[in-house]
Design a protein with these regions (language model features):
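A general structural signal for well-ordered alpha-helical segments in protein cores
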Residues: 16, 20, 63, 75, ...
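Rossmann-like NAD(P)(H) cofactor-binding subdomain of soluble oxidoreductases
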Residues: 23-24, 45-47, 56-132
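Solvent-exposed alpha-helices and their adjacent loops that cap or buttress functional pockets
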Residues: 3-6, 31, 59, 85-87, ...
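Glycine- and other small-residue-rich loops at beta-strand/loop junctions that grip anionic moieties
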Residues: 68, 93, 135, 157, ...
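A generic structural signal for alpha->beta connector loops
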Residues: 34-36, 52, 89, 111-114, ...
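Internal alpha-helical scaffold of NAD(P)-dependent oxidoreductase catalytic cores
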Residues: 85, 103-113, 129-167, 180-189
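NAD(P)+-binding Rossmann beta1-loop-alpha1 motif at the extreme N-terminus of oxidoreductases
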Residues: 1-57, 127-128
């Protein structure tokens, strides 16, 4: 993946728990310079604290991408601080469960290109499937960038309509849990 635009302009992670850390680890090992990454996280992990990134520091003026990875219940408090980047130059990529594109547009404004992505649990070990859906401002280059970044945690699937996200979540999100349960039952038999 070509990280040149991100390396020059920066990537902001709003929240960096298990999924965000798994992605960042993949990006750094694939050549993204650590100094191109800004993380806003009130409770950073020990791993995150030893990375050579900008942790809870002043943000770049025009980042290439803001990855929103906060828990849904924290979204209303966390996202407004990113609204200054809603001018159309910065791509917003959300992996926050259950938060619609319309919810992001209400906070970020009508000019922000937004992609909603829903990774499943196996993504934490790089074997996931992530469904993607974007707003009307999304161009092919945005999808290519999102797919390249999300490739760090597995495969991606483009959806035609955001409404399909619920169906995908039911199958890809719950499916692995059922398989793991079935394996446990077979092992116990």
């Amino acid at each position: 993946m070509d990280f040149s635009d991100i390396a020059q302009r920066g990537l902001v992670l709003l929240g960096c728990g298990k999924m965000g850390s798994a992605m960042m680890e993949g990006w750094l090992s694939s050549g993204l310079p650590a100094q191109s990454v800004w993380v806003i996280d009130p409770h950073p992990s020990a791993w995150l604290q030893v990375q050579d990134i900008h942790l809870n520091a002043a943000l770049p003026s025009d980042p290439a991408l803001v990855l929103v990875a906060v828990k849904p219940q924290l979204m209303q408090a966390a996202l407004p601080q990113m609204s200054r980047f809603g001018n159309g130059n910065t791509l917003f990529l959300s992996i926050a469960a259950g938060i619609t594109i319309a919810s992001f547009e209400a906070i970020l404004g009508p000019h922000a290109p937004i992609i909603r992505a829903m990774p499943n649990t196996p993504a934490a070990i790089g074997q996931g499937i992530t469904a993607l859906s974007g707003n009307r401002l999304i161009e092919e280059r945005h999808l290519v960038l999102a797919e390249g970044l999300l490739g760090a945690i597995g495969q991606t699937l483009r959806l035609e309509h955001e409404a399909q996200m619920d169906a995908v979540t039911g199958v890809s999100g719950s499916g692995p849990a059922y398989v793991f349960y079935m394996i446990d039952c077979l092992a116990a038999a």
